[in-house]
Structures are given as structure tokens and as C-alpha cells.
Amino acid sequence: MTATSAAELLDYDDVVARFEPVMGMEVHVELSTATKMFCGCANAFGAEPNTQVCPVCLGLPGSLPVLNQQAVESAIRIGLALNCEIVPWCRFARKNYFYPDQPKNYQISQYDEPIAINGYLDVPLDDGSTWRVEIERAHMEEDTGKLTHLGSDTGRIAGATNSLADYNRAGVPLIEIVTRPIEGAGARAPEIARAYVTALRDLLRALGVSDVRMDQGSMRCDANLSLKPIGQAEFGTRTETKNVNSLKSVEVAVRYEMRRQAAVLTSGGQVHQETRHFHEDGYTSPGRSKETAEDYRYFPEPDLEPVAPDAEFVEHLRQSLPELPWLRRNRIQQEWGISDEVMRDLVNNGAIDLVAATVEQGASSEAARAWWGNFLVQKANESGVELDALPITPAQVAAVVKLVDDGKLSNKLARQVVEGVLAGEGEPAQVMADRGLEVVRDDSALQAAVDEALAANPGIVEKIRGGKVQAAGAIVGAVMKATKGQADAARVRELVLAACS
């Protein structure tokens, strides 16, 4: 850790004893539309640089924007799911700034007239309680291009020798969701920040409006934070930590900023209003001074008509909303007959949707929970990734469960198959065949291993023949070891008892 070193940070318990954190979360979500916000260019991740561009998204003279209707519908659906009021009339504005990621030198956004206002999201926390986060607004805008800075140790523009611009992302439809100040969280502020982004991600995924891949930038979080002495009404000076790119990092970034700002304030210093960059090592570093709305010189976008959603159309979209995550979880809990504690563990591990998808592929809920809630959670923790980022699908887990149910794999062998899938060795059946892991059920092969184990353990054989049937477990264990766990244990036991009778 650099920037403010760990030794210079105030102890977290001291922070929450002296200061009250105030948070504000801004989440940018790229919409999964076929084309961009204001032109017909493809909206697809991973294409060769600057191959999905046109005069509109490059800001060439004479080009005019045309609004993407699907993006408007997605914005309304998001607003409705967040319990927002969908306004009867809104319009776009130009946000003016000069930076290479925006070839027009302005971004088409919404300023004082967003499409959705005054909502809320009830966020489940680790202990089973909920925290209501109030939503100030959700507004439409276009994304910027992506810059790659070369020659800089940090990967940022400071110190770079060259900067490469890829405008494939310029003009991609975005929804920015802005909360009202989150007060009263105290020591739980980092947890609530992570839980909010998690709940929002799950909601957007359920709506089908975005793939919400934080690792690919289709969901990006900016965390605003200020501290004020406990009992003080006036807010402190806030910082904005930009583009935090994982759920865990949201929690780490908020906790770090609380400790850093507290250290500044207790030493008699002043917190500067600025943007800050989050580093994967767990610290933030200064960016630029935080701009105000006046700096961007907003004015109405003259090339786009206002948007006036018809009330009947809005109601149609409301009625078409899918089952929302919290309702789905309640239904699933009843169907599976699991306790609140088990459900809470599945939710906290990010496993609930993966388990449900595995059940839909034919696995039992018990088997699906065992895989996603135990073994695969461990693998995700070992890899330092979210559970849904593991390179294995619910369909593949269901296939492993079927191989076990069919008697082709034992639970121990199944874990080896899953490890092979995670290593990219192919589908479960292929991994089983390539690694030679299928359970041995052929009596002739098993009998040879049993005979060898019996010959090596005459004392145990005498115990079995003397009526101590439980001693057969030692012979079964020897056979399982000799066959590297591939023998059918139940059949081996039958053969052992038959040989000793």
C-alpha cells in the first residue's frame, strides 16, 4: 500500500467513534442494446479498436444524433424497478468538457430534467436486515471512449508517453443511477455500499437491461464520501473515488477513504474536494479537483427533441417487469424449504441465482447448493474473484451432478472433474474421460483389487469372519486407495463380505 500508508491511517474503530460517514453512490450502467445511444453503430464489447464508429459517435461536422428507443424503454424499466417516478417530460443536455475520450468535446447527458426521480431500493445486509437507499435520479447519457495510456507506471495519463483512443465505446447507452446522501450508516457504511451495488447489480440483471459485468466496465461505481464529527449537521468535504470495478473493491474503497479522511481531519488538515483513483492494492490516490455543474456549462441539447413518455406506455412497461430479485428469493426459499440462515448465506456468497439456474438445468436444489455454496465458494475465494466470475456455468455444474447421480462419479472424483472444468479442460464428461476418473463398476476389476487387499490384511479378514463386519471398512479403504478413489465403494463392500463369508 502506498499513497497514505497503513501506518498513517486512523484506526477504523477510532474513525467511527469520532466521525459520521456520509456516502453517495453513482453507478453507471451500459445498456445491452444492439446499437449505440444516438447512432446505428454496433454496441458490442471486445471488437477491434475503432471498428464500431461513425460520423455521429466521432463527432464529425454535420452529423446528427437519433435517439435509441430501446434505451429509453430500458431507462423507464430501471426507474420503475427502483420505485421511481417516471417524469412526463424530460430532455437531454450537453455537458461540455475537453478531453480526448469525447471527440465532440461534449457529452450528451441529462442535467436538471432526468427521466426518473425520487425512488428507493431496499438493500439486504449480511445479518438479514435491510437498509433503504433513497434514489435521487436515474438519467440517460452516452458513454465516452476508452483511453489507454502507455509509458506510465500507473496506467494513467500522468507520466504517460502516449495515449491511445478507442471510440468503440463512445456513444454506448448509459444509465447513471444517483443516490441521495446515505447517512446514519456508521461503522456499517462500507458494508452498505457493497450491499447496495450488489442489490442494484442483481436487479439490473433480472431486468435484462445490462450484463452488469464490472470486470468489463459495463457497470462502474463512483463512491462519494465525506466525514463529519458526530453530532454535526453540516456535511464535510467529499471526495469521489472513480470507477471502482468490483463489489469487494467498493467496500475496500469506502473503508480506506473513511480512514484516510479521518487521519487528515484529526491532524488538523483539510480534505480536498477531488476525484480519487482506486488501486487494486486497496488504496486511493488523488486525481483531479472535483468540478461543479457550472464548470460543465450545461445547456439543452438542440439536436434532440424532448422525451415525453406516454402514461399508458409506462404502465405497460410496469406490468411487463419480470419477477424482481427479492420476490424471487422469497419464492425460491419456500419452494426449496430452506431456513433464513441458509438463504442469507447463499445471498451473501452471491450464489442464489447460480443455484437457481443449476436447478433449472436439472440438478436437485440440495446438490446445487452444496456445489455453489461450499466447494465453488472456496475456489472463488482462492482465486480472488466473485463467484459468478468462475469459469464454470450452472449447466456444467448440473452435468457434474448428473454424473454423480448416474453413479459414474463419486463425490470425491466429481471435485476433480470440477477442477478440470475450472482449468479449461472442457465439459465435465470430457474431463472425466480424459482424466480417467469414471467410477469402476466392473466386478472382475474390482474383485482383483479386493483379493489383493484381503491377502495383505489377514488379521482384518479374521475379524470380519469372526463377526466384526464393521472391520470391512478397512478393506474397502485399501481398495479405494489402490484404485485412486475410482472403485464403487458400495459394490466393493459387497465383494469383501462375500469373500469373507
Curated annotation (Swiss-Prot):
Taxonomic superkingdom: Bacteria
Keywords, sorted A to Z: ATP-binding, Ligase, Nucleotide-binding, Protein biosynthesis
Disulfide linkage: none
GO molecular function: asparaginyl-tRNA synthase (glutamine-hydrolyzing) activity; ATP binding; glutaminyl-tRNA synthase (glutamine-hydrolyzing) activity
Pfam families assigned to the protein according to its UniProt record, in alphabetical order: GatB_N (PF02934), GatB_Yqey (PF02637)
Keyword Nucleotide-binding (UniProt): yes
InterPro entries on file: Asn/Gln-tRNA_amidoTrfase_suB/E, Asn/Gln-tRNA_Trfase_suB/E_cat, Asn/Gln_amidotransferase, Asn/Gln_tRNA_amidoTrase-B-like, GatB, GatB_Yqey_C_2, Gln-tRNA_amidoTrfase_suB_CS, Gln_synth/guanido_kin_cat_dom
Keyword ATP-binding applies: yes
Gene3D superfamilies the UniProt entry points to: 1.10.10.410
Catalytic activity: L-glutamyl-tRNA(Gln) + L-glutamine + ATP + H2O = L-glutaminyl-tRNA(Gln) + L-glutamate + ADP + phosphate + H(+); L-aspartyl-tRNA(Asn) + L-glutamine + ATP + H2O = L-asparaginyl-tRNA(Asn) + L-glutamate + ADP + phosphate + 2 H(+)
Enzyme class: ligase
GO biological-process terms attached to the record: glutaminyl-tRNAGln biosynthesis via transamidation; translation
EC number: 6.3.5.-
HAMAP family: GatB
Family as reported in the entry's similarity comment: Belongs to the GatB/GatE family. GatB subfamily.
Quaternary structure, from the entry: Heterotrimer of A, B and C subunits.
Biological function: Allows the formation of correctly charged Asn-tRNA(Asn) or Gln-tRNA(Gln) through the transamidation of misacylated Asp-tRNA(Asn) or Glu-tRNA(Gln) in organisms which lack either or both of asparaginyl-tRNA or glutaminyl-tRNA synthetases. The reaction takes place in the presence of glutamine and ATP through an activated phospho-Asp-tRNA(Asn) or phospho-Glu-tRNA(Gln).
UniProt name for this protein: Aspartyl/glutamyl-tRNA(Asn/Gln) amidotransferase subunit B
Species, as recorded: Mycobacterium sp. (strain JLS)
Gene name of the record: gatB
